[in-house]
Amino acid sequence: MSSTIYPTGTTIYNPEKAWSGYTLMPIPKIGAVLIDMNGNVVKVWKDFQGFPNKLLPGGYCMGSLGVRDNEYSYQDQTDVAQIDWDGNVVWKFNKKELIEDEGHEPEWMARQHHDYQREGNPVGYYVPDMECKTDSGNTLILCHETIHNHKISDKQLLDDVFVEVDWEGNIVWEWRVSEHFRELGFSQAAKNVLFRNPNQHFTKNGELGDWMHINSMSTLGPNKWYDQGDERFHPDNIIWDAREANIMAITDKKSGKIVWQIGPDFTATKEMRKIGQIIGQHHCHMIPKGLPGEGNILLFDNGGWAGYGLPDRMSTDGTKVDIRDHSRILEINPVTLKVVWSYTASDNVTGMMPIIVNTTFYSQLISSAQRLPNGNTLITEGCFSRIFEVTKDKEIVWEYRAPFTKESPGQFVYRAYRYPYDYVPQLDKPEEVPVERLEVETFRVPGAAPGMLDHFTTVPEAKGYTSNLDACVTDDQIDDSSTDPDDEVTGAKF
C-alpha cells in the first residue's frame, strides 16, 4: 500500500501537561491493543473485537468475540463479552436473537453495534469515583433489529434498539427508535426521502435501510441539571446520536419519550444556528460529574456527509444532503445550547487560512472525544488512526499515530480511551519519556536535501510582492454568520 511518509507511534508527549495513563484502542484484524504514553504496546487481546473496546478496573477488557457474516448483515457483533487479563471470558451476552443465515449454523447473537455501558459508570471511560462493576451489574447495549415499518418506509429497515440486560443475561428493558419516528423532527421533505431510500445496504437477506445509524449511547449519570430540578436530565436517562439523521437526543428511560434534542435542522432556532450544522457526528455524551465541564455535552462533529432533505445538485436522491470537509469537537451547554468550548485545526488562525487549515483535522467516519480529569480532551481522529490530547487552550500535549502493519494495512481506530495506570494492577507503572515536537520546517529524512534556499538569481525588473497575497476566495466572502461577539467561542462554523 502506498501512502505519504510521516512518523507513526508517539510523536508528541509532554508529561507535565498530559494526563498520563494507558490508552486502549481496537485495531482491525489484530484485536484490543493497550499502549503506554510512549507508544509501547503493553498488551494485545488477540482477535478480541471492539465496537468499542473498554477497560475495566482490575485489567478486565470488554468487547466482542465475533462478528456476523457481513454478506447477511451490516455491523452486527455476535455478542458483548468481558474477559480477564489472561483472555478468559467471565461474562457474555448473546441471547437476543437466534440467527439462521444460509450456509451458517444457527447462532444466538446480540447484534450489538457501536456502544454499550456497564453499570457503575455512565460513559465507559475513567471518571473519579465511578467505576464499572466487574462481577455484577446491568449492561446497556446498543443493538440492531430488522423490521418493517411503513410509517417510515416500504423498505426493510435496520432499526436501533437499546437493550438492558442483567448479569444473568435477562433482558430487563428495551427501547426502539422506530417507535418514536414522529418525535424526531424530520421535515416532510426528509420523510419523503426516507420512504424512498432509508440509506439502503444490500445483503443476501435483502435490502437493509440503516435509516438512523445510532452510533453512541450512554446514560447521563448524576449531573447538576437534575440536581437543579430539570427532569429531562434524570441520571438514568439515555443520550444518543444518529449520524445519518444529524440528530442528538435524550430518551426518558421511564416514559420512553424523547425529552431533549438538537438537530436535524440547525437553522430551526437562533441557538442552533450559532452552533452551525452538525454532520455525521459520533460519541455524543454528557461529561460526567467529577470531570471538568461536567454536565456539558461533548461530541465529535465529523463533517463529511449525512442528513435527509430536498434533492439538489450534490445529492440527487435527497440523502446525505449536508456536507462539510472538516471536523470539529464541540462542548455544548445542554440548557442554553451555547458552545462553551470547541476544537478545530484552525483555532487561532485568521483570514483565509481557516478554510485551508481546517481540512487537516478531518475524519468523515467513526471517531470520539473523551474529557480527562485534568481538563484536557483525548480526541480520536479515527479515519487516520490518529489519537491526540489537547489542553483547554488547544495545545497538543500528546499525539499518537497507529502504525500500519501487514496484519492491518490502512487501519482505522473506531474509538480510543485513556485509563489510569492502576486499572491494570498486573503491570508496573511504565517510564514516562518526553517526546519533543519535531520542527517540521527543518526535519528531513536521511538522504533528503537540507531544504535551505540557495542559488539565487536576481531579476532586475521584478517588483517584489505585496503585503497580501490574493487567493481564489477572499476572506470578506467567508460566511461568518455563526459569529457572535458576545459568545465565548466564535466562528464555530469553521
Language-model features and meaning:
Residues 1-494:
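Histidine-/acidic-rich catalytic cores in large beta-rich domains
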